[in-house]
């Protein structure tokens, strides 16, 4: 099968600069790298094609020969020089591309060379979901929680070695935590299978933790929940996560708060909302109603005469405290005018009489039916 044009392979024009060629190569190489395309059998061939194209175009002499003769410049019979130091030498190839691979795959492959890895590793962070009541969120509370986690092994003091002895340098990777393997035309670095990337091994593993340096245990912790927390509030306990590996520092524990729903109050940030039922008489004539407050007390609220369902009144400072200070929110009271049920005959009689006398006392009703009449007149007119 005929080879594709090298410029087409890299997706650049024939006038591309050296920097543009390098940038295009890095993009293509990263996209087609075999380790990133395990499920694509064509990726390796395409990756080699990209490497071959860049190997030619990055070299001024080979690029000049390719621009003049095309692929024929590297197929023999074109005189000396064109193939010198060319694509076929794996050692030279890997060396020539080391700067690109180092920059492109440094994080992906763990980097080349460098100092031996430290055996100590920080422990993982942990998450704990804690539910509190709205009353507890209002006042603040001290909670005791039980956290299952990995903790430092007491028998080996977290070293993983019997009697607390020191670990030794891994003979496979010489303490690097990585080993090199030839893959195609370049060298790939992978995690050392002997020490699992630790760089050191334990000759005589601790019989309690089997060399891990930590054991599973449930711990009881006291957590201070400040007043004003809400669902989603995160509390960090430094150093209370999983123990580090072989003497490394512990991770952190993050407490995520969930505030339970309340029977009377709904919450919106620092504000509280309470729906209060009132009788028809109280709504029509006005009066007072006693409402509970989150602090355990109550407040008497005046109901204006002629109040309707949905009317809101505000009790300032009776909401939730702000988490980081700054006072408290408000409590909003919404009236719900309650229609009486299970009426006696006398009550029904009085209501019918009241209805006859109240034609001019229902402005919203009159306005609504006036609009309905206008609507139907417009339909029939």
Curated annotation (Swiss-Prot):
NCBIfam families associated with the record: DnaJ_bact, PRK10767.1
Example of a GO biological process term: chaperone cofactor-dependent protein refolding
Gene: dnaJ
Gene Ontology CC terms: cytoplasm
Primary location class: cytoplasm
Cofactor: Zn(2+)
Zinc finger CR-type: from-to: 140-218
Domain J: 5-70
Organism whose genome encodes this protein: Cereibacter sphaeroides (strain KD131 / KCTC 12085) (Rhodobacter sphaeroides)
UniProt key word Transcription: no
Comment field on protein domains: The J domain is necessary and sufficient to stimulate DnaK ATPase activity. Zinc center 1 plays an important role in the autonomous, DnaK-independent chaperone activity of DnaJ. Zinc center 2 is essential for interaction with DnaK and for DnaJ activity.
InterPro entries from the UniProt entry: DnaJ, DnaJ_C, DnaJ_domain, DnaJ_domain_CS, HSP40/DnaJ_pept-bd, HSP_DnaJ_Cys-rich_dom, HSP_DnaJ_Cys-rich_dom_sf, J_dom_sf
PROSITE patterns referenced in this protein's UniProt entry, alphabetically: DNAJ_1, DNAJ_2, ZF_CR
Source organism, top-level taxon: Bacteria
Localisation per UniProt entry: Cytoplasm
Positions contributing to Zn(2+) 1 binding: 153, 156, 206, 209
Key words, A-Z: Chaperone, Cytoplasm, DNA replication, Metal-binding, Repeat, Stress response, Zinc, Zinc-finger
HAMAP family: DnaJ
One Pfam match: DnaJ_CXXCXGXG
Name of the protein: Chaperone protein DnaJ
Family to which the UniProt record says this protein belongs: Belongs to the DnaJ family.
GO molecular function: ATP binding; heat shock protein binding; unfolded protein binding; zinc ion binding
UniProt cofactor note: Binds 2 Zn(2+) ions per monomer.
Ligand binding (Zn(2+) 2): 170, 173, 192, 195
Each CXXCXGXG motif repeat, start to end: 153-160, 170-177, 192-199, 206-213
Function as written in the Swiss-Prot or TrEMBL entry: Participates actively in the response to hyperosmotic and heat shock by preventing the aggregation of stress-denatured proteins and by disaggregating proteins, also in an autonomous, DnaK-independent fashion. Unfolded proteins bind initially to DnaJ; upon interaction with the DnaJ-bound protein, DnaK hydrolyzes its bound ATP, resulting in the formation of a stable complex. GrpE releases ADP from DnaK; ATP binding to DnaK triggers the release of the substrate protein, thus completing the reaction cycle.
Oligomer status and interactors: Homodimer.
């Amino acid at each position: 099968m005929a080879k594709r044009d090298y410029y087409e392979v890299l997706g650049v024009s024939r006038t591309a600069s050296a920097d543009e060629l390098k940038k295009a190569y890095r993009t293509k190489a990263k996209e087609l790298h075999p380790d990133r395309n395990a499920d694509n059998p064509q990726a390796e061939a395409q990756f080699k094609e990209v490497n071959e194209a860049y190997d030619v175009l990055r070299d001024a002499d080979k690029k000049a020969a390719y621009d003049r003769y095309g692929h024929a410049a590297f197929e023999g019979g074109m005189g000396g020089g064109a193939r010198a130091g060319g694509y076929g030498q794996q050692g030279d190839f890997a060396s020539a591309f080391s700067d690109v691979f180092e920059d492109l795959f440094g994080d992906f492959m763990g980097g080349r060379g460098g100092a031996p890895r430290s055996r100590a590793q920080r422990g993982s962070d942990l998450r704990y979901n804690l539910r509190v009541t709205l009353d507890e969120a209002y006042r603040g509370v001290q909670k005791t929680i039980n956290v299952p986690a990995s903790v430092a092994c007491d028998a080996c003091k977290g070293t993983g070695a019997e009697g607390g002895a020191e670990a030794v340098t891994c003979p496979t990777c010489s303490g690097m935590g990585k080993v090199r393997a030839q893959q195609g035309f370049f060298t790939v670095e992978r995690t050392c299978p002997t020490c699992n990337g630790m760089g050191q091994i334990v000759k005589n593993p601790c019989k309690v933790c089997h060399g891990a340096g930590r054991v599973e245990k449930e711990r009881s912790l006291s957590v201070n929940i400040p007043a004003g927390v809400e669902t989603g509030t995160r509390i960090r306990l430094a150093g209370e996560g999983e123990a580090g590996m072989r003497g490394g520092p512990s991770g952190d524990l993050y407490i995520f708060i969930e505030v339970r729903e309340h029977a009377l109050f709904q919450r919106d940030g620092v504000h509280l909302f309470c729906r209060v039922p009132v009788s028809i008489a109280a709504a029509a004539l006005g009066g007072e109603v006693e409402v509970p407050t989150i602090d355990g007390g109550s407040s008497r609220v005046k109901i204006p005469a002629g109040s309707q369902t949905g009317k809101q009144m505000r009790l300032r400072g009776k909401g939730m405290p702000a988490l980081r200070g700054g006072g408290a929110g408000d409590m909003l009271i919404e009236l719900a005018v309650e229609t009486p049920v299970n009426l006696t005959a006398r009550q029904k009689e009085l209501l019918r009489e009241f209805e006859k006398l109240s034609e001019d006392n229902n402005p919203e009703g009159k306005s609504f039916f006036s609009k309905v009449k206008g609507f139907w007149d417009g339909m029939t007119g």
